[in-house]
C-alpha cells in the first residue's frame, strides 16, 4: 500500500508497453455544448442494464408512473433498480430487442410518455456530511448508478467492497478512444458538480490521495477542473500523454504508479479504486439532488450524422429516434456502432434503446468505414504481441481459440484481455482477433457456469443426504426414547422391566437347550447294560401308524371323488374273460366249479361297479380303470391255476356271456 503512494507522490509518469496512436477524430463532436433532444413518446427500459442480476418488478401493465419512479427493486447491491425516464403509462412488460450485437431480446418495460415529464417527490440536501457513509452508499444504490465508463459495474457494490482498502482514489477522465467526447464536454460544462461528487466519494472512502487523470488532448477540460477546484489541494490533477488505451484501468494505474495490478486481481488489492467522471456526476445528482440515473451524455458522431455533438439522452430512448433527431442519413451499407471504433459493438437493430452502457453512437460513411478485408493466414509477425498493452500473446491465443483449447487459453491469461482491439487493428492478415477472443471467453464462461451448477447440485444432493441421515437418526432416537419410556412405565405399573424379563426368558431357554440329555438304559439277562430304546420304538410305531392312516384317508378320499371309468372296466373284464377261457381249456379238476363261481362273482362285482359309476357320474378316470384292469388280470390268473375240469369250459363260457352282456349294456 505504502509503495503505491510513494510512487504516486514522486510525480513521475510511467509508460506502459504497447499501445497505438490512431486518428482521434474528436473534433467532430467536442466543439458543440451539451444539448437536449426532444422528449420522445415511447421508452423501452431493459430490466437489467448493469453487470449483475435483474431486479424484481414493482409495477404492472397499465400503471401510471412518474419521472424518477423506481420500476424494479433489488435485494442486494448488485441487483440495481431501474427508473422511469419520464412520466407516463406502462404499456407492456415483455421481451424487446437488446442493445447488443446478437440482436436477441431481453425483458423490457415499455413506457408511453404523457408529455408532462412530471417528477416524483424529491428530497434534495445541501450538506452530504449529515449522512453516514452507509446511508450515502445506500442512496447511491437506490439511484441505480453503475460505472459509466463502460464496465457498468454497480457503483455501490464497488465502493463497499473497497471501503477499508483504498489509499489512492483515481478519477478517470482520460477518454482515450477515438471519436468519443462525452466526458470531455461533461468536464468542461459540469466541473463543479463532478468535483462535488468526488468529495462525496472521498468522504465515504477516506483515501489518502485523490487524483483526476486527464489526457493532454483535452486542455479545456483540464482548465475547467482546475477552476472548479479553486486552489484546493485535497484533489490533484495529473495530465497524461495521449495514447490508446491509457484510459483502461490497469494501464492508467501503471501510468500513475508504475505498479501492475496482478493477473486476476482487482485494483483494490493494491489499494487503488478508480471511477469515471460521468459516475462522479451521477453520484452528485443522486445525493444532492435526489435524482436517480435516468439520463446520460451520449456522443453522436460520424459523417452520416448531420448534427454531431453530445446530447443528454433519456435511458430507454430508441436509438432510431435519436439518430433521426440528429439528422442521420440512413444507409444500409454502413453500420451503426454503440461505442467507439476500437471497442464499439455493431448494432443489428436500431430499434434497440439507449442504456447505461451506451456512451457513443457512431455512424461512419465510406471515408471512415470499409468492409473488413478477407481474413488471411497468420504470418507470425508478432505485431499483435508488440502492440498488446497487457503483455499477452494474441497470436497464440488465436490458435487456442480456433482449436477450442480452453485450457491453454486460460494458461495464456485470456481473461486478462481488455478487448481494446489493438491486435486486430495492427494485424496485417486482417484477422478479427477480438471476435475470436470474445467467443472463446463466452465458451469458457459457459463451461464454468455448467460446472458451477453441477457443483451446486452436488452440494444440494449431499446436503439432502445428510439431512435425511440426520432425520433418520433423530427418528431412531425418538423411538428409543419412547421405548424406554414405555419400559419405565411398565416397570412402575407391573413391577418388572419387560425387556429385562424377555432377556431372562431367552437366557433360560438357551440354558435348557444346552443341558445334557439323559440316556435311559436297561440290563439284559446276561447282565449287560444296554440302551433302553422302548420310547424310541414307540415313537417310530406311532409315526408309521400315522402314515398308514393318512394314506388310507387319501385313498378313501380319491375313491369318493374320482369315479370309475365304465368303458375301461368293461375292457379289463373282457381281457380277464379271454384269459380265463384259455386257461379253462387246460384245467379239468372239480375245483374249477368253485373258482368259476368266483369268476362269476368278480364279474358281478365289476357289473355292480359299472352300474354304480353310471349312477354317480359320467366322468372318466383313466387311473381307476387301469387299477381295475390289473385287479381283474390277477384274479383271472389265479383262477386259471385252479381250474382243470371240462366243466370249467362251460362256466367260463357263462362268464364270457355275462361280460358280453355287460359290454352291450
Curated annotation (Swiss-Prot):
Entry annotated with the keyword Iron-sulfur: yes
Gene Ontology molecular function, alphabetical: 4 iron, 4 sulfur cluster binding; electron transfer activity; metal ion binding
InterPro entries (UniProt xref): 4Fe4S_Fe-S-bd, 4Fe4S_Fe_S_CS, Ion_transpt_RnfC/RsxC, Nuo51_FMN-bd, Nuo51_FMN-bd_sf, RnfC_N
UniProt keyword list: 4Fe-4S, Cell inner membrane, Cell membrane, Electron transport, Iron, Iron-sulfur, Membrane, Metal-binding, Repeat, Translocase, Transport
Gene3D superfamilies: 3.30.70.20, NADH-ubiquinone oxidoreductase 51kDa subunit
Alphabetical GO biological process terms: electron transport chain
UniProt remark on cofactor binding: Binds 2 [4Fe-4S] clusters per subunit.
Cofactor(s) this protein cannot do without: [4Fe-4S] cluster
Record: residues binding [4Fe-4S] cluster 2: 388, 417, 420, 423
GO CC annotations, alphabetized: plasma membrane
Comp. bias intervals (Basic and acidic residues): 465-477, 485-513, 602-615
EC number assigned by the record: 7.-.-.-
Coarse class of the protein's main subcellular location: membrane
Membrane topology, as annotated: Peripheral membrane protein
Residue stretches making up the 4Fe-4S ferredoxin-type domain: 368-398, 408-437
Regions of compositional bias (Polar residues) in chain numbering: 554-564, 585-600, 643-656
Location of this chain's protein in the cell: Cell inner membrane
Sites where the protein binds [4Fe-4S] cluster 1: 378, 381, 384, 427
UniProt key word Cell inner membrane: yes
Start and end residues of each stretch annotated as Disordered: 465-568, 580-623, 637-665
Family to which the UniProt record says this protein belongs: Belongs to the 4Fe4S bacterial-type ferredoxin family. RnfC subfamily.
Self-association and partners: The complex is composed of six subunits: RnfA, RnfB, RnfC, RnfD, RnfE and RnfG.
Function: Part of a membrane-bound complex that couples electron transfer with translocation of ions across the membrane.
The protein's name: Ion-translocating oxidoreductase complex subunit C
